Amino acid sequence: MEGSWSYKLLYVFLCIVLGILYGIANPILLAQGLGFIFPITSSNGRAVDSIYSLIYPTNLNVFIRLTIVSVTVFVAYALIFVFNVAQNYVGIKLYQQTCATLRWKAYLKMQSMSTSFFDTQNNGDLMSRLTNDMYNIDNLFTQAGGQAIQSLFNILTTSVLIFLLSPVIALISLSILATLITFSFAFLKKSKTSYSQVQNNLGDMSGYIEEVLTNHKVVHVLKLQEIMIKDFDQYNKSMIKPTVRGNTYSIFLFSWFGFISNITYLVSISIATAFSVNSIPSFGISVINYSFMLSYIASLRQITLALDQIFTLWNLVQLGVVSAERVFKVLDLNVEKDTATIDKLPDIKGNIRFENVAFGYNKDKPTLTGINFSVKHGDVVAIVGPTGAGKSTIINLLMKFYKPFEGKIYMDNFEISDVTKKAWREKISIVLQDSFLFSGTIKENIRLGRQDATDDEIIAACKTANAHDFIMRLPKGYDTYISNKADYLSVGERQLLTIARAVIRNAPVLLLDEATSSVDVHSEKLIQESIGRLMKNKTSFIISHRLSIIRDATLIMVINDGKVLEMGNHDQLMKQNGFYARLKQSSVR
């Protein structure tokens, strides 16, 4: 692929060069053609040679000479057209491949980041980097990239040409341009700062919109629309000032450059006229006539047009550069390396052991301290405790979302730090409180649990999860298209689908985090039945406030303030009349 890109880039560059060379030749061919059609004589009466007269006889009639010049200039224009189309066609394909690769690498980097990274990031801003910022980079490549390269090369080659025409006048003209353009750099820097602020504010606003739309039902229930509208108004208004400032700088630069061009033309024509009137040689030509003036002004126009194109595209360039910086910040993120050496676990039973485990989302404030327990294959462990006690943190550690500060976690005799994340998680199924469904058919969603699952296995898993009956009532059965926003599925039905996904995975360790909350009585019964089947021959960890689920656990682990206070089955803990008993009594009241 890289070799193919190299050839395409070379092809684009050659087309740009050839197009520019023919573009430079055009004003010369036209000016020299006028000298060929209407012969020019010097002050001593001698005819001034034209490049056409070196090829064609000078005694041709005017109509033939006009035809020769017209055809020559037309061919040059046609070649410019061909080379421009060719370089744009191949260039656009190349630029799109580059943008697609850049977007893919940024997405891959995000997917490689640890859970702790997303805990501290604005998801909307990350989405903005992959969408809005990549759109700006795409514009930079497709609209500004090739044109900027072409314009810069045009400036370089045409500058050489006008030096050949008249070094003195060229030096004066280019000095004026360079001096006035240098003055522009201060504004270019200020406009980049403004556009950088625009993109950052846009990322913040995208994050806010994503948050509000995701929780739109909560917004309506709590009647927060007016508050959300006011907050959005603040985000929206934060875009105005930097956008206006950045565009004002750009408009000023564009107008300023028009002024620069006019001043340069005026000075160049004045000097050339003075040289001509006073018969002063110009270190390259012995006589200055209207043919020279036409060639020189047309060539100078090539330079100013190229600069004009660069300034016109400057908004796109600034936005593209700022967006590229934001995307490359993602690409430069340090991925936490998985130093584990075991990338494949054998068939295991699912014995789990915690040895003096300590962890905290903030190192200065531990969430868990001194956690010790051991469970065997087939055990059902209910983790109970008040809100914020650390129940879900144990699940997060078991899923290897985070590393413990101290202690060790074992699955059978394999220590968690020795096993890669992929290999460790292959042995675990999880059903969360928030049942997330991906866009696709029901069959595709279930197959996410195990990619090689057959249709028959999917149907069997859904029957185990009590999901088959309601699936068959849907318009297209297992081929019904759903998404995470599928409101025609009840909360209970969505949860049954996630349970079916866990069934098809058939991992030896099962994690259930409030899997039966927020459902009606009928759905709860179906979910409990399906969970009961799912837990057979598995080591299961359950977080739930449902007494009916907790009391059937073989082991209940009571956690408070990040510590294990009590362990035992329901009857044992109730007899102790300790924290668990008080917790249950308060929940009944």
UniProtKB/Swiss-Prot annotation:
InterPro entries: AAA+_ATPase (IPR003593), ABC1_TM_dom (IPR011527), ABC1_TM_sf (IPR036640), ABC_transporter-like_ATP-bd (IPR003439), ABC_transporter-like_CS (IPR017871), P-loop_NTPase (IPR027417), Type_1_exporter (IPR039421). Keywords: ATP-binding, Cell membrane, Membrane, Nucleotide-binding, Transmembrane, Transmembrane helix, Transport. SMART domains: AAA. It is a multi-pass membrane protein. It comes from the Bacteria. GO terms for biological process: transmembrane transport. Residues 9-319 form the ABC transmembrane type-1 domain. The chain crosses the membrane at residues 9-29, 66-86, 161-181, 251-271, 280-300, 303-323. The keyword Cell cycle does not apply. ATP binds at G385, P386, T387, G388, A389, G390, K391, S392. It is found in: Cell membrane. GO terms for molecular function: ABC-type transporter activity; ATP binding; ATP hydrolysis activity; ATPase-coupled lipid transmembrane transporter activity. GO terms for cellular component: plasma membrane. Residues 352-586 form the ABC transporter domain. Belongs to the ABC transporter superfamily. This is Putative ABC transporter ATP-binding protein MG015.
